[in-house]
Amino acid sequence: MFRMLNSSFEDDPFFSESILAHRENMRQMIRSFSEPFGRDLLSISDGRGRAHNRRGHNDGEDSLTHTDVSSFQTMDQMVSNMRNYMQKLERNFGQLSVDPNGHSFCSSSVMTYSKIGDEPPKVFQASTQTRRAPGGIKETRKAMRDSDSGLEKMAIGHHIHDRAHVIKKSKNKKTGDEEVNQEFINMNESDAHAFDEEWQSEVLKYKPGRHNLGNTRMRSVGHENPGSRELKRREKPQQSPAIEHGRRSNVLGDKLHIKGSSVKSNKK
């Protein structure tokens, strides 16, 4: 089941290395857990071959074996049905995102939890989100957390057609290492500021309520009453959230190692 759920993550370089390491840890854990019961599990999977050797046992034990085999078959059928459902869902999202003039949102996530004895639980989480808007506008968000290695990382990308600015942050809670890396696709680092402003400008066109706000302003031109003018004079200017966010980002950047890289894409 884990293979089915994270198949879409394995092809993404952001997740692939961590997923492969986590899968190997899971295999070792399952192998160590099944060793004391290995022969019993094999006998369940080979019930017909061992039936002649179990004639001395009572019917109750035979019925229990058949029940176990039936349970495994039912579980396999459930996994198969879920696999087909996930594949169909992924195809539908793929068809939806093809339309450049439509809005779409796609989200995928996977989580595993394991605990053996007195050891602390091991949790692995991975998620990805993609939002699209007309005009080739896209935002991608990816996040991953592995409690076993202590690694946490995230990436946010803003895209306009084949151009993109991606910021990646990672932190290892066990070693204390932190890093920020910027990736520039089909543009130079010097173009990043202008690109970010262009992306924000395009996104604001589709912000809910913007059209109504514009109509309200148009209707109010030349018809403003004295009460509203007095209210505007009393209003105190508030600091822009974007400015405050920028200050927090600068503080974070001072503490982390920031790297930038420009990438040229051959896609058309």
UniProtKB/Swiss-Prot annotation:
Residues 50-125 are annotated as: Interaction with COPS3. GO terms for biological process: DNA-templated transcription; myeloid progenitor cell differentiation; regulation of cell cycle G1/S phase transition; regulation of DNA-templated transcription; regulation of signal transduction by p53 class mediator. The keyword Transcription regulation does not apply. It holds the Pfam family Mlf1IP. It comes from the Eukaryota. One of its GO terms (cellular component) is perinuclear region of cytoplasm. Phosphorylation is required for binding to YWHAZ. Residues 56-65, 226-237 have a biased composition (Basic and acidic residues). The modification Phosphoserine is found at S8, S32, S34. Residues 44-66, 209-268 are annotated as: Disordered. The record marks S16, E17 as: Breakpoint for translocation to form NPM-MLF1. GO terms for molecular function: DNA binding; protein domain specific binding. It is found in: Cytoplasm; Nucleus; Cell projection, Cilium; Cytoplasm, Cytoskeleton, Cilium basal body. It is linked to A chromosomal aberration involving MLF1 is a cause of myelodysplastic syndrome (MDS). Translocation t(3;5)(q25.1;q34) with NPM1/NPM. Belongs to the MLF family. This is Myeloid leukemia factor 1. It comes from Homo sapiens.
